[in-house]
A protein has these predicted regions:
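Structural motif corresponding to the intra-repeat A-B loop/turn of tetratricopeptide repeats
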Residues: 164, 229-230, 261, 311, ...
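Compositionally biased, proline/threonine/alanine/serine-rich low-complexity intrinsically disordered stretches
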Residues: 31-153
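Catalytic glycan-binding domains that act on GlcNAc-containing polysaccharides
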Residues: 188-190, 203-204, 208, 350, ...
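Residue at a conserved register position within TPR or TPR-like alpha-solenoid repeats
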Residues: 161, 226, 258, 308, ...
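TPR repeat positional signature
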Residues: 154, 182-183, 187, 219, ...
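Solenoid-like repeat scaffolds
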Residues: 140-148, 171-181, 191-195, 204-213, ...
Length: 782
């Protein structure tokens, strides 16, 4: 979020720790309820259902083709959230007119973000648990028996009660357990379920379990309770003594407490921050305005309107426009008409009074209107008039997305100069979008505008921001390409060597091939042994994970695994955590643990690419055979090995097959088709998925690049890209550039991720360390 210059830096999402609560506990547990001056609120409002997920591609993609990593377990009660990012909300239709809306699933894929430089998206511990969601019982005769008094049936029953909001009944069942791990687990479930556990009980849990990995959800639950229970100002201020609020209820509660203590200026500043950065509903809006009628100005209301418009939150935008007064409502009508592709969009834009036509919202809408009318040059001219002040842009990342779409359309028209001008103007604010923007500007400058010196500067900026293996390798590889173009061969070699230090990343693998390195080393930490291992295994949270695994409640184990992985910094402990997930046969958790570790530079390469996710199956002989590593590479990207995964557009199972595609493939290989088996029988889904890959390899004459792109975006789109950008199977087409020119961001990312997965899985499954990516990129060459 971009805040006005006068406001404080954005509050960080901090974990709720025992240390942060020490100052609070004494006051909180003794503080009176119903303190004067504290206003309660309704349950924390979520942004409207019409608010879309972040864009995932640069061109219109039919929902039947949007497949990628949208896996969702239909019965999974863990709602979507994204690491270090605000939750993503589902919508229907396309996003920003060109990019398909992404219905981020409840069990978000490890690579659910289409942006390869974005933090990994997971169903994180700060996700919401649906109280009424049943706990699925997964029968498994081979499941080890839980030791002690923790009966798995009783454990599932207690969890189900808490999820249904039956706290008293859940507490009675919990009190029947004697295992401290089971008791702590059930208390954690109760807090997560949002079943009215309350502030004091939440704080008491964290104080009693200082080693429990307390994710952001526990903090949000505590903040909600501070407001709804009208805690005393002293309690509220003590709670926030060491950290800032992370939720709208928390910010409102702190503002009320500050005002009660006479800190009016600080309270007003907190309210302005709340108004500009948080999404919440009409009820809380009214309470904020009633409590602080003089704190917010027309500028604040305009900012809230602008932010809501960029998120397609029409109701909030309309209310904010009303608060701002004047003709701001005309901006909302124009923006919505353009977004909805209404035939009246031009008239709505014309109805905006001249006094508001320099407003950022009007400029954005007008640029999008021209771009959607296939007038990229006109859109670029409008974008050139956009303000540069981030406080005026409000959401620079949304502006960058529009710039990216326009720049790529201009590139397709052969206007590299204007494409570079559009891409190189700074707008993006988040690290992942800044990386994407600088990369695009550098790539266009190097490969299309003939300016390697300018490209080198942009790639250097990427390198300065990059942290994950994917983005570090990409920056270094393209720095090498720019240096080569400048005739700096030794410098280029050093950049390629830097990229090659990331052997599990696509561009790291490409750099290794360029250097003639044929090995693919995978890193692993030392084992945690002796007393340290015993202490680790004895932690209540680790024992709770084992209880969940043995009881078959994987949908609750996953967020706890992720909380633990985020808290741990010792690679040996992360390895031990992964070992536990392996013991529990939880491949999805392994992907999450491994990915979180390698993004921080920790050596958990093997755990990041589990080999336990697909059961043994017989292949069909009626279609060309594909290597087993390819099936794993696809399944990891598509579903994270969740056999019950189902996407918002209907793709199902390990291989995320669309039912119609699976039915055609079943007919081709002469086997019975059963749509339910796609999610109930992982071997069946893997078998059909492998057969479909064989069909695609046949269709594209062995081209891995085209087969992977087709698996994700459909063969029709791939044919269009061949017509537009050339055939990557031909020697006169640079396959690296061809992949980068794929107009769907999701598919660009998908092809690169599956290609890198394939290299790693060859090593993991077949003990082959040879790197074959150069050959894989050029398979099917004519």
């Amino acid at each position: 979020m971009i805040r006005p210059a006068a406001s404080h830096p954005a509050p960080k999402r901090t974990s709720l720790t025992a240390a942060a609560l020490v100052a609070t506990v004494g006051v909180a547990l003794a503080g009176p309820v119903g303190q004067a001056g504290q206003a309660g609120t309704d349950a924390p409002a979520t942004p409207p259902a019409t608010q879309p997920a972040p864009p995932a591609s640069d061109a219109a993609l039919s929902t039947a083709q949007v497949r990628g990593a949208q896996a969702v377990k239909a019965s999974d009660p863990v709602a979507a959230d994204a690491l270090k990012l605000d939750p993503v909300h589902a919508s229907s239709g396309d996003d920003k007119g060109e990019e398909p809306a992404r219905t981020l699933p409840a069990a978000a894929s490890a690579y659910a973000s289409a942006d390869p430089d974005a933090p990994v998206a997971f169903p994180l511990p700060d996700a919401t648990v649906t109280p009424a969601a049943p706990v699925p019982e997964v029968p498994d005769p081979a499941r080890p028996k839980i030791s002690g008094d923790t009966d798995p049936t009783l454990l599932r029953g207690a969890i189900d009660l808490y999820r249904k909001g039956r706290v008293a009944d859940g507490d009675r069942m919990r009190d029947g357990f004697t295992d401290p791990a089971a008791k702590a687990l059930l208390e954690w479930v109760a807090i997560r379920a949002g079943a009215g556990i309350g502030f004091n009980r939440t704080v008491a849990f964290v104080r009693a379990n200082p080693d429990w990995p307390a994710g952001p959800l526990l903090r949000r639950r505590a903040e909600e309770a501070l407001l709804s229970e009208k805690k005393a100002p002293a309690t509220v201020r003590a709670y926030f003594a060491t950290s800032k609020p992370v939720s709208a209820p928390g910010k409102f509660a702190l503002a009320l407490a500050l005002r009660a203590d006479g800190c009016d200026a600080d309270a007003a500043e907190m309210i302005r921050d709340l108004w500009r950065t948080e999404s919440f509903g009409r009820s809380l809006e009214a309470k904020v305005l009633d409590a602080f009628p003089d704190a917010l100005t027309r500028v604040d209301h305009r900012y809230r309107m602008e932010r809501a418009l960029l998120k397609d939150d029409w109701e909030s935008a309309g209310r904010a426009a009303g608060y701002a007064g004047g003709a701001y409502a005309s901006l909302v009508r124009a923006r919505r008409a353009v977004e909805d592709k209404s035939s009246g969009a031009a008239a709505a834009l014309a109805a905006v009074p001249p006094s508001l036509r320099s407003d950022a919202s009007y400029i954005f809408s007008r640029a999008q209107y021209f771009r959607r009318a296939d007038k990229a040059e006109a859109a670029a001219a409008v974008l050139a008039t956009a303000p540069s002040n981030p406080d005026v842009l409000v959401d620079g990342d949304e502006w960058w997305i529009e710039r990216r779409i326009v720049a790529r359309k201009l590139l397709d028209l052969g206007d590299a100069k204007t494409a570079y001008a559009v891409a190189s103007q700074p707008a993006a604010r988040s690290p992942e979008k800044r990386i994407e923007a600088e990369f695009h500007a550098g790539w266009i400058a190097l490969r299309f505008a003939g300016d390697p010196a300018a490209a080198a500067q942009h790639f250097a900026r990427v390198a300065a921001i990059a942290e994950s293996p994917i983005s570090v390798a990409r920056a270094a590889y393209w720095q090498g390409r720019a240096a080569e173009a400048l005739g700096q061969s030794e410098e280029a070699k050093r950049f390629y060597e830097r990229a090659a230090l990331q052997p599990i990343a696509y561009y790291g693998q490409v750099a290794r091939a360029r250097l003639g390195q044929t090995s693919l080393p995978l890193r692993a930490p030392a084992d945690l042994e002796g007393a340290e291992r015993q202490a680790f295994d004895g932690r209540l949270s680790i024992r709770a994970l084992r209880l969940l695994g043995e009881a078959g409640i994987k949908e609750l184990a996953l967020p706890l695994y992720i909380d633990a992985a985020r808290d741990l910094s010792d690679s040996r402990e992360l390895q031990a955590l992964g070992d536990l997930a392996t013991d529990m046969k939880d491949a999805r958790a392994l992907v999450a643990i491994g990915k979180l570790a390698v993004q921080r530079g920790l050596p958990l390469d093997a755990h990041a690419y589990p080999t336990i996710g697909i059961p043994t199956y017989e292949t069909f002989t009626a279609v060309p055979q594909v290597e087993r590593a390819m099936v794993y590479a696809i399944a990891r990207q598509e579903s994270q090995f969740d056999p019950r995964a189902q996407s918002g557009v209907g793709a199902r199972g390990l291989m995320q097959m669309m039912p119609a595609t699976a039915q055609r493939t079943a007919r081709r290989v002469s086997t019975a088709f059963d749509v339910d088996r796609l999610t109930s029988d992982p071997a069946y889904c893997a078998r059909l998925g492998q057969a479909h890959l064989g069909e695609l390899m046949e269709d594209w004459r062995g081209s891995y690049v085209l087969a992977f792109a087709s698996y994700n975006a459909g063969g029709g789109n791939v044919k269009k890209w061949i017509d537009a950008y050339g055939d990557p199977r031909k020697g006169d087409v640079d396959v690296i550039d061809w992949v980068e020119r794929i107009p769907f961001t999701e598919t660009r990312n998908y092809v690169q991720r599956v290609m890198e997965n394939l290299q790693v899985y060859r090593s993991r499954l077949d003990s082959r360390s040879a790197l074959l990516i150069e050959g894989d990129l050029h398979r099917g060459a004519r």
